[in-house]
Regions:
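Secondary-structure boundary elements
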Residues: 40-161, 194, 377, 382-493, ...
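Hydrophobic/aromatic-rich core segments of domains that either
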Residues: 118-134, 143-153, 158-251, 323, ...
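Short, ordered, surface-exposed loop/turn motifs in non-cytosolic proteins
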Residues: 278-297, 318-320, 559-584
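Short, acidic Ser/Thr/Gly-rich low-complexity loop/linker segments typical of extracellular
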Residues: 294-315, 578-593
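Short Pro-Gly-centered beta-turn/loop motif in secreted/extracellular proteins
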Residues: 311-329, 336-338, 409, 590-617, ...
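Structured interaction patches on ligand/partner-binding surfaces of diverse proteins
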Residues: 329-352, 612-639
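Short active-site neighborhood of thiol/selenol oxidoreductases, capturing the structured segment around
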Residues: 668-692
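Short, internal strand/loop/helix patches
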Residues: 711, 720-755
């Protein structure tokens, strides 16, 4: 049976499950549950009460009580069978809950718990955790994708997942076998762009980490052992508002307790900020946003109100945070680290100014690798076998021509949704026909709303707006994760949260053949009128408004900067500034080099930056007011480093490698010639290697124009490189030589070095680095200016 969302119109309700279960199975479940109730410290009622007490609004609306009952019974059955000796606190918060993050819930636990328990029966808790991660690797491997998170069953169906989906699968699998597990995030890296998620597992009274679907031979080992040492924040959201496990609490909500786990990984410090007014007085009640520079924005990772002493604090890595403090219409921006920091509210909303910030991340100090060479070799052989197992699994996709669904949607969309989207459908307009609105779970809504809305007197945008304003109860506090509630569920319950109410507005419009969307740039709710103009809608106002827009024209002069064409999210970003803080303009469709940008009237902050090879950032902040019908010209400033590339290590250009198709080894120098060259040692799979290939592809034009050889050793291919020399590194001689020359004591690929024929290394990167292209391009540009080549 294919698992689907639990809904009267969707396949796989609890009633259907019970009908398809054998009589023997039903008797077994009932008898096991009865036995558990008599011997366990927590029973079915206590479990259900615990889940419902902190259940997000969407989960309570979409999934019936029978769904939760079936999963609770299975969880209690596993607890009795496996007898791991898990204390009630860890079991209730880290085994019982189905929800890991913001994924679509499915039937994973009831489908796979027995399989997983059989696989690890008789093992120790540590062995079982490692083995389940191997099972996860048999099901899925890494591939980047969009921000919507697949449920674990859909990830298995796909065979692929980004780190957030791999970790959801791994946590779900561990919990299904009765082992406490949680998903841990660095919300943003400080030394490079992007973020990462992995798994912590509770073994012998302590939390240990694993790379999800990236099994190793021991716990506390993953490819991110080095990058995690440069993190500024590591956190997880624990199901339940009253969790008390000893970790630092970042925030408590009605649904979860957000905790900071950085102290379990690396040295940390208390970053303390004191908010002051212009006269030096401490300001109470100011909003203090702790931010990390990433993807060219100051990404907010935590937010507090200053106390009576004007202070707010957060445990962080030993590096710079960017602080935006604000109260009423005043604000201030500064970099902070350690305990003695102040931010002055010396700016006013609407005030135009510019400032420079230099942001320094923590230094690298890789976590210890406790595995032996023999363990590594055995694990590598297992990974190859697991790759073949995964490749043998079918990975079906649906066909949905004309519905404007993404590749990911075609993995988990149900037949019912596809059929419903065609109900009384004659349009080809994507803003009418597509069942995908935002990141909500896809559940049929068109037939339901097209039939019931007119009965409720709803036929126009004005009537939709009035109905949603007057008849839908908002319960934002019950959905602090911001989970997107499917429109059919909000309609039936007459209850929603603010963002999901927006989704219901779009669904109602589309069901009545009115083009509608949530603007992908600024998140505003819109419909398209008969003149083809997009009109903004405020559901708390009775009057739709035509958008008043102006143009921001960014004037970029390259000068000595190595970047020829700054890119959005890489070199600059634009955020709206208001009393509510900042809101990023998501200009995903902005064409490279197009610096004339239409924006709604408002006050904006332009953040630009150059990330240097050591991970630090030279950032620039510029604010601007955009007025209707006016083109406002603002310089786009990139602060490049004035220093020439430095020699940072040494290597032997006479070291041999085996060129592709050759029978005898040859020296690097004989393949590259005199001058500079690039060496890339990488595998074809694994998240760090996938990112390296994508980064090299992104700057292939610059590398081709540079004209120097790129020696690629290992299984990675970069077809766009015109000067690539492919080969292998027998016995790892080249890799070991580079690591010795850089005095690097850690293992891990990719290894990328920019060298010259004198044996000097001027750029080096090892492991995960999503800023590789930007850094490498900058060094090459500097070399060209210095040497003319």
């Amino acid at each position: 049976m294919r698992p689907e969302l639990w809904n009267s119109t969707a396949q796989g309700s609890a009633e259907q499950i019970y009908k398809t279960m054998s009589i023997r199975r039903i008797i077994l479940v009932i008898s096991t549950a009865a036995a558990l109730l008599s011997c366990s410290r927590v029973g079915e009622k206590e479990c259900l009460d615990f889940l419902y007490e902190s259940m997000p609004l969407g989960d309570s609306l979409v999934y019936p009580r029978s769904y939760w009952e079936a999963n609770v019974r299975k969880s209690l059955e596993v607890r009795q069978e496996m007898d791991w000796g898990i204390p009630d606190r860890e079991w209730m918060h880290f085994v019982l809950p189905l929800r890991v993050n913001n994924e679509n819930l499915d039937d994973f636990r009831t489908l796979y718990a027995d399989t997983l328990c059989r696989r690890v029966k008789g093992m120790s808790l540590e062995q079982a955790a490692l083995e389940i991660n191997h099972w996860c690797h048999e099901q899925a491997t890494y591939k980047p994708s969009d921000a919507r998170t697949l449920g674990p069953v859909a990830t298995i169906t796909s065979g692929l997942g980004r780190c957030g989906e791999e970790s959801v699968l791994a946590v779900a699998a561990l919990r299904a076998a009765g082992i406490p597990a949680r998903q841990v995030y660095t919300p943003r890296w400080a030394h490079t762009d992007d973020n990462h998620a992995w798994v912590e597992v509770w073994v012998d009274g302590k939390w240990h980490y694993m790379g999800a679907c990236e099994p190793e031979s021991v716990l506390d080992l993953a490819w991110f052992n080095a990058p995690v040492s440069r993190a500024m924040l590591l956190h997880t959201k624990v199901y339940g508002k009253n969790y008390n496990g000893g970790e630092d609490v970042i925030k408590r909500t009605d649904a979860y307790t957000e905790i900071n786990v950085i102290k379990g990984y690396i040295p940390s410090e208390r970053t303390v900020v004191t908010v002051l007014d212009r006269e030096g007085n401490k300001v109470e009640g100011a909003r203090v946003d702790f931010g990390i520079y990433n993807y060219a924005e100051f990404y907010r990772v935590a937010s507090y109100l200053s106390g009576h002493d004007g202070q707010a604090a957060l445990d962080t890595g030993i590096g710079d945070m960017v602080i935006l403090a604000s109260k009423d219409s005043l604000f201030g921006i500064a970099t902070c680290r350690g305990k003695d920091n102040s931010v002055v509210l010396d700016k006013r909303l609407g005030q135009e100014f510019s400032l420079d910030l230099t942001i320094v991340p923590p230094v690298e100090n890789p976590l210890e690798d406790r595995s032996s060479e023999a363990q590594k070799e055995l694990n590598a052989r297992r990974l190859i076998q697991e790759d073949s197992i995964r490749a043998s699994h079918p990975h079906p996709r649906k066909n949905a021509v004309g519905l404007y669904l993404s590749e990911k949607d075609l993995i988990d969309v149900s037949d019912e949704v596809l059929e419903d989207a065609h109900f009384e459908q004659t349009s080809t307009d994507p803003y009418i026909v597509s069942p995908r609105i935002e990141r909500e779970a896809l559940i049929p809504f068109r037939q339901l709303l097209r039939t019931e809305a007119p009965k409720a007197g709803i036929r126009s945008v004005e009537e939709i707006t009035a109905f949603l304003r007057d008849s839908i109860r908002l319960s934002d506090s019950r959905n602090p994760q911001g989970l997107r509630i499917p429109p059919a569920a909000s309609w039936k319950a007459r209850e929603s949260d603010t963002k999901s109410r927006d989704i219901l507005f779009v669904a109602l419009c589309r069901s009545l053949d009115i083009p509608s969307r949530i603007n992908p740039v600024d998140g505003k709710l819109q419909y398209r009128n008969d003149d083809g103009v997009w009109v903004d809608v405020d559901l708390d106002s009775s009057t739709p408004t035509l958008r008043r827009t102006g143009t921001l024209s960014l004037n970029y002069i390259q000068g000595s900067c190595p970047v020829k064409t700054p890119k959005y999210y890489t070199h600059f970003s634009i955020s709206e500034l208001s009393e509510d803080g900042t809101r990023l303009m998501e200009l995903d469709d902005l064409k490279e080099g197009d610096y004339n940008i239409a924006l709604p009237e408002g006050y904006y902050m332009i953040v630009s930056g150059m990330r240097l090879a050591d991970g630090s950032v030279n950032a620039h902040v510029q604010t601007v007011n955009i007025k209707e019908g006016v083109t406002t010209v603002v310089p786009l400033v990139l602060r490049s480093s004035d220093s020439a590339p430095q020699v940072i290590g040494n290597m032997d250009p006479e070291m041999n490698f085996l060129a592709e198709g050759a029978e005898k080894e040859q020296s690097l120098l004989s393949a590259t010639g005199r001058g500079y060259f690039l060496i890339c040692i990488s595998d074809s799979s694994g998240e760090p290697n996938v990112h390296a290939r994508r980064q090299l592809e992104a700057i292939s034009g610059s590398l081709n124009q540079w004209g120097r050889k790129v020696v690629v050793l290992g299984s990675m291919r970069v077809d766009a490189l015109q000067n690539a020399v492919y080969g292998s590194d027998p016995e790892g001689k080249v890799e070991k030589m580079l690591l010795r020359g850089m005095e690097s004591e850690r293992s891990g690929r990719p290894v990328i070095a920019l060298c010259d024929s004198f044996g000097r290394i001027v750029y080096f990167s090892q492991g995960y680095n999503t800023s590789l292209g930007e850094q490498l391009g900058g060094v090459i540009s500097s070399l060209e200016k210095e040497t003319g080549r």
